[in-house]
């Protein structure tokens, strides 16, 4: 029975996480995997070439050798394992699973800050720090989405929490309160 993409990602991501943790190179492996993900997204042919069933294993290995030379032994070994077991097509999903485990281990959360206008880096950083402190997290990675319809304020979405501090929501509450009073 073939494994689903999610099952493959869970198994390989968990294995990489455990291996990196056991060898005390978790931060290094995390940084390298994030760099690899960024490069793979910027150049999608990288994954498709290393996943191509027509290309010989020798050719794939030579391509991978050129790419992996700047990575740690742990990441090189992992990439060779993916190549050996024909799992390169699942690379991004595996990295995402690994990243999720890393974030959980380090009390890091990711989320979205929706605002009427784009926040600068300093504002986004202060918002992240404030949320992290309030919810006892080490860090919060926020992506800023712009939605002029919220009029002002911010809507924070991190994990299963939503904090709606938008002007649109406040006006909606005031309106509901006025209607209820009548």
UniProtKB/Swiss-Prot annotation:
Keywords: ATP synthesis, Cell membrane, CF(1), Hydrogen ion transport, Ion transport, Membrane, Transport. NCBIfam families: ATP_synt_delta, PRK05758.2-4. Pfam families: OSCP. SUPFAM superfamilies: N-terminal domain of the delta subunit of the F1F0-ATP synthase. Its main location: membrane. GO terms for cellular component: plasma membrane; proton-transporting ATP synthase complex. This is ATP synthase subunit delta. Induction: By low pH. GO terms for molecular function: proton-transporting ATP synthase activity, rotational mechanism. It is found in: Cell membrane. Belongs to the ATPase delta chain family. It is a peripheral membrane protein. F-type ATPases have 2 components, F(1) - the catalytic core - and F(0) - the membrane proton channel. F(1) has five subunits: alpha(3), beta(3), gamma(1), delta(1), epsilon(1). F(0) has three main subunits: a(1), b(2) and c(10-14). The alpha and beta chains form an alternating ring which encloses part of the gamma chain. F(1) is attached to F(0) by a central stalk formed by the gamma and epsilon chains, while a peripheral stalk is formed by the delta and b chains. Increases 2-fold following exposure to low pH. Transmembrane segments: none annotated. HAMAP family: ATP_synth_delta_bact. F(1)F(0) ATP synthase produces ATP from ADP in the presence of a proton or sodium gradient. F-type ATPases consist of two structural domains, F(1) containing the extramembraneous catalytic core and F(0) containing the membrane proton channel, linked together by a central stalk and a peripheral stalk. During catalysis, ATP synthesis in the catalytic domain of F(1) is coupled via a rotary mechanism of the central stalk subunits to proton translocation. This protein is part of the stalk that links CF(0) to CF(1). It either transmits conformational changes from CF(0) to CF(1) or is implicated in proton conduction. InterPro entries: ATP_synth_OSCP/delta_N_sf, ATPase_OSCP/dsu.
